[in-house]
Design a protein with these regions (language model features):
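ATP-dependent carboxylate activation and anion-phosphoryl transfer catalytic cores
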Residues: 7-10, 15-21, 26-28, 35, ...
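ATP-binding N-terminal substructure of ATP-dependent carboxylate-amine bond-forming enzymes
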Residues: 1-133, 168-171
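ATP-dependent carboxylate/phosphate-activation module, predominantly the ATP-grasp catalytic core
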Residues: 203, 207, 226-233, 237-294, ...
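Short glycine-enriched loops at secondary-structure junctions
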Residues: 67-70, 113-115, 136, 244-245, ...
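Short, charged, surface-exposed secondary-structure boundary motifs
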Residues: 74-76, 92-94, 139-145, 193, ...
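Active-site nucleotide/adenylate-binding loops and adjacent lid/helix of ATP-dependent enzymes
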Residues: 2, 138-223, 230, 242-243, ...
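Conserved hydrophobic "DFG−1" position in protein kinase catalytic cores
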Residues: 198, 227, 238, 304-306
Length: 384
């Protein structure tokens, strides 16, 4: 029912399925070890993965969910949920601050780049450290073209990409890649592979960009065009504390959802991935984070693809949030990375036996309307 505040509505969910807790949980005294987490986009798949990872912590944290979508939030796994304004509204932060005060929140986990940006820009309003990378880091990483130029200037491997100032620029950009055959066209901002596809000639690129301009309102100048990387796809997620990498895990993406529905054969959503040991990939990612910020704190996720001759190059970085589709794998490794993050954010640094990730092979299998499943390599043929 309405709380009396104009921007927020409180929903007390019953403990059912994966949920837990009662109203009495909110009256318990707060100790130094308690984690009281607010998870945004509650009810989404990304938030569900985060909440399941948080529930694996002992003692289990108190978990509050928030979402502006009153339908999606009905699927939330949190103990208590709030309907809040959209993150892009001026009332969003007021609502979050109200929840922080009401429920003694000491940890906020944003599950998308919009929330990471809003929290980053208003961090001084919060009564505790939001455990985010610097504002400048988040801004740089949310502009893929600016990040690409930043790394090129510092000798960190990235694909060659160029801004599309106008459709007339396309001929000149293609001329720079004469003989390469396939280029990668994408929007410089946004998530979920927005505006991204492979193109083989100027006409394809022009038609693709014009379609997004006319139907989705994305400006031509928001597109980039450059080197297509056909090799293996990696992500490296790491948690940092004052310039020290507490834990980093390398994951290889093996296959994707709905690859038959787009010409590139890839997407931003893996349905099969695995933990790997890739020293060169890890080194590049750690060097990249240190180049951006010499005293980083929080979570940073780096994506890479290999060139035709097998050299990894950074395609983008998501700073201040966990990747939506591999969180379950990060939590299922011998050291739960979400626990490392939550404890560091609330003042406790864990002892981690394998700070550069597990050497054991774990596979993450995901599909629509199915809970994600993690399987060790040794168990792949069990029961078959």
């Amino acid at each position: 029912m309405p709380s009396g505040d104009p921007w927020i509505r409180r929903i007390v969910t019953e403990a059912s399925g994966e949920g837990r807790g009662t109203e009495h949980d909110w009256l318990a005294p707060l100790t130094n070890q308690d984690i009281r987490a607010l998870v945004t986009r509650a009810g989404s798949g990304a938030s569900g993965n985060l909440i399941r990872a948080l529930r694996a912590i002992t003692p289990a944290p108190v978990i509050v969910g928030a979402n502006h979508d009153r339908f999606t939030i009905k699927s939330s796994l949190a103990d208590l949920n709030y309907v809040v304004p959209v993150p892009t509204s001026t009332e969003f932060v007021d609502a979050v601050l109200d929840i922080v005060e009401r429920d003694r929140i000491n940890l906020i986990i944003g599950s998308d780049e919009n929330v990471a940006k809003v929290l980053s820009d208003t961090r001084e309003r919060f009564p505790f450290d939001l455990f985010l990378p610097r504002r400048e880091t988040i801004d740089l990483c949310q502009d893929k073209q600016a990040l690409n130029v930043f790394f090129r200037d510092r000798g960190i491997p990235v694909p060659r990409f160029y801004e599309v100032g106008s459709l007339d620029d396309l001929d000149g950009i293609f001329a720079r890649f004469e003989g390469d055959g396939v280029l990668w066209c994408r929007a410089r901002r946004g998530s979920g592979s927005v505006g991204a596809t492979a193109v083989t000639n100027v006409d394809q690129a022009r038609s693709w960009i014009a379609q997004w301009r006319d139907l989705r309102g994305i400006k031509v100048s928001d597109f980039t065009l450059g080197e297509f990387l056909p090799g293996r796809h990696y992500t490296v997620t790491s948690v940092w504390y004052r310039g020290q990498a507490l834990l980093a895990q390398t994951i290889e993406i093996l296959s994707y959802f709905a690859v038959g529905n787009n010409p590139s054969g890839t997407s931003s959503m893996p349905n099969l991935s695995k933990t790997v040991v890739a020293p060169e990939v890890l080194r590049i990612c750690l060097d990249a984070v240190r180049a951006i910020e010499d005293c980083a704190s929080g979570v940073i996720n780096v994506e890479l693809k290999e060139t035709l001759d097998g050299h990894p190059a950074i395609t983008e970085i998501n700073a201040g949030r966990f990747p939506a589709c591999t969180t379950t794998l990060l939590a299922a490794c011998p050291t739960n990375m979400i626990e490392v993050f939550a404890r560091a954010a609330t003042g406790e640094i864990m002892a981690i036996p394998e700070p550069h990730g597990t050497a054991q092979e774990h596979y993450l299998v995901q599909d629509i309307d199915c809970l994600p499943r993690v399987i060790t390599a040794s168990a792949l043929l069990e029961g078959l």
